[in-house]
Amino acid sequence: MNQQQVITELQSRGLKLVSDGVGASGRKGGAGPSDHKAVTVGDTTVMVPVFTEGAAQSPYVVERDHTTGTSVLLKEKEIIAPISFPTQPKFYGLETAEGIPYWKIALLHSRNVLATTVLQNCIRYDNRKTACQFCAISQSLEAGRTSAKKTPEQLAEVAEAAVRLDGVEHMIMTTGTPNVTDRGAAYITECAQAITARISLPI
């Protein structure tokens, strides 16, 4: 099985983790790549389901050699490939002057992508006729894993730290829909301008 086949299999069937304590933490439910963990196969890092029902039934498991610190991917006890897990980013240990943890403002996706939902509420969410069927934007907020509104200053501060401490190379910004006039375009633009004024980071 080549590297691309391994990645396709993992993303389709998930990965059964014997221990959750490997690599950066994943999260159950909510917006973004929830129920997943970042996994590196060869030179490619992808998000793989680990907390889903399918992953619990997956034939793929990880075995970790605690003496060497390396991991291998197994299928029916046969070694398929060496794999690794990106570690918890350093910027997760920081907080703003107001005491907000950086991870409530933006998260690391994969190994080098910073992601944030600028406005965590949406006027469409509570109406089944207008809500996006895939969206779980309010779940993260209800679970206390994020803040409702990220300010331009907060986002610039976190982005600078993520680049400096963890080598983040680009950023994704999404938002809930706050109104029917510009749908949040002006505010997300203000946030993007604050970030690029502080750090050179493709958004």
What annotation goes with each model-predicted range?
Residues 51-131, 138-148:
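N-terminal [4Fe-4S]-dependent radical SAM core
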Residues 129, 160-162:
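An intrinsically disordered, low-complexity acidic/polar region
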Residues 1-61:
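Short Lys/Arg-enriched alpha/beta "domain-start" segment
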Residues 3-5, 11, 57, 88, ...:
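Residue-identity detector for glutamine
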Residues 136-155, 162-203:
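Core AdoMet radical
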Residues 8-11, 16-17, 21-22, 59-62, ...:
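Aromatic-residue detector
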Residues 4, 106, 123, 178, ...:
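Proteins with a high burden of low-complexity, intrinsically disordered sequence enriched in S/T/G/P/A and R
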Residues 33-41, 79-82, 98-99, 135-139, ...:
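Generic detector of short, locally flexible boundary/turn motifs and exposed helical patches
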